[in-house]
UniProtKB/Swiss-Prot annotation:
Its main location: cytoplasm. Residues 109-292 form the Tyr recombinase domain. InterPro entries: CB, DNA_brk_join_enz, Integrase-like_cat_sf, Integrase_catalytic, Integrase_recombinase_N, Integrase_SAM-like_N, Recomb_XerD, Tyrosine_recombinase_XerC/XerD. It is found in: Cytoplasm. This is Tyrosine recombinase XerD. GO terms for cellular component: cytoplasm; Holliday junction resolvase complex. Site-specific tyrosine recombinase, which acts by catalyzing the cutting and rejoining of the recombining DNA molecules. The XerC-XerD complex is essential to convert dimers of the bacterial chromosome into monomers to permit their segregation at cell division. It also contributes to the segregational stability of plasmids. One of its GO terms (biological process) is DNA recombination. Belongs to the 'phage' integrase family. XerD subfamily. Gene3D superfamilies: 1.10.150.130, Intergrase catalytic core. Residues 3-88 form the Core-binding (CB) domain.
């Protein structure tokens, strides 16, 4: 049981790093809280994948009995909730056992994003005459111009593309499908990738996935994260940048240019518009900075 529990936790922490772009400290905090929960389950001989809401409540009540602070318990609930949401999205579970557990009030942090100038600097650092770099630029172009999650981009298959209609059929969290448009720049680099880069990398091998690795299979999330870090080092950008930062940038730039919130929600594949609303704070922050810089009463 311990080995399978550790594997699930490791997969979750990789997801937090690669897809959610959390800091090392945040990932450590999630891991610390979930290890406490894991130890409780193993003491009770309960498997992660067979947990019920009552089991979680017994763990939380034990924490209260040990005089653990309410702030720490609230953090533990968030960690457990996010972990089981991840397991459900990964189709390890049919239901999330935390759904009946009251969500504590916690402040959501505003995610980091790149400015439009920083996006251009990043893309300019990638050399399109190198066929591997052409592939990488194509991946980053879709992450930014279509707001894809890194897992969605890595899982794209050739038949998910409609080049004529300039759309992608994307399978998001929980197996939900959505149609995502892309623009002329994406179409141009996709065509060049398909004609030049992809055949060069595959070397006569077959693969159903759009983005391929040297091994002839699909490129994984961790590889894309490493590649993005490599290109960021070529720029003057000092922010921590992950593939998810490009998705944050996509949403922020749409709202800065007055896209309506409902449309952005649909493009991102969010079920709850409250998840999308966090980006309005980011856009409003930019507007405040413009006002302060350029208005005589700023």
């Amino acid at each position: 049981m311990t080995s399978s529990h550790n594997n699930l936790l490791q997969n979750f922490q990789e997801y937090l790093s690669v897809e959610k772009g959390l800091s090392d400290n945040s990932i450590y905090s999630y891991g610390y809280d979930l290890n406490k929960f894991k130890n409780f389950l193993e003491k009770e001989h309960i498997d992660f994948l067979k947990v019920q809401a009552d089991d979680i409540m017994r763990f939380l009540n034990e924490e209260k009995d040990r005089k653990i602070s309410s702030k720490t318990i609230a953090r533990e609930v968030v960690a457990i909730r996010q972990f089981y949401k991840f397991l459900k999205d990964e189709k390890k579970l049919d239901t999330n056992p935390t759904e009946k557990i009251e969500t504590p009030e916690v402040m959501r942090s505003i995610p980091d994003y790149l400015t439009q100038d920083e996006i251009e600097e990043l893309f300019a650092s990638i050399k399109e005459d190198n066929l591997y770099e052409l592939r990488d630029k194509c991946i980053f172009e879709l992450l930014y111009s279509s707001g894809l999650r890194i897992s969605e981009a890595c899982n794209l298959r050739l038949n998910d593309m409609d080049l004529e209609g300039m759309t992608l059929t994307v399978e998001g969290k929980g197996g939900r499908q959505r149609l995502v448009p892309f623009g002329e720049k994406s179409l141009d680099i996709l065509n060049r990738y398909l004609k030049q880069s992809r055949p060069f990398i595959l070397k006569s091998r077959n693969c159903e996935y759009l983005f391929v690795s040297k091994k002839g299979s699909y490129i994984n999330r961790k590889s894309v994260w490493r590649l993005l870090n490599h290109y960021i080092k070529r720029t003057s950008i000092l922010k921590k940048v992950t593939p998810h930062t490009l998705r944050h940038s996509f949403a922020t730039h749409l709202l800065e240019n007055h896209a309506d919130l409902k449309s952005v929600q649909e493009l991102l594949g969010h079920i709850d518009i409250a998840t999308t609303q966090i980006y309005t704070h980011m856009a409003n922050k930019t507007l405040r900075e413009v006002h302060k810089k350029f208005h005589p009463r700023g």
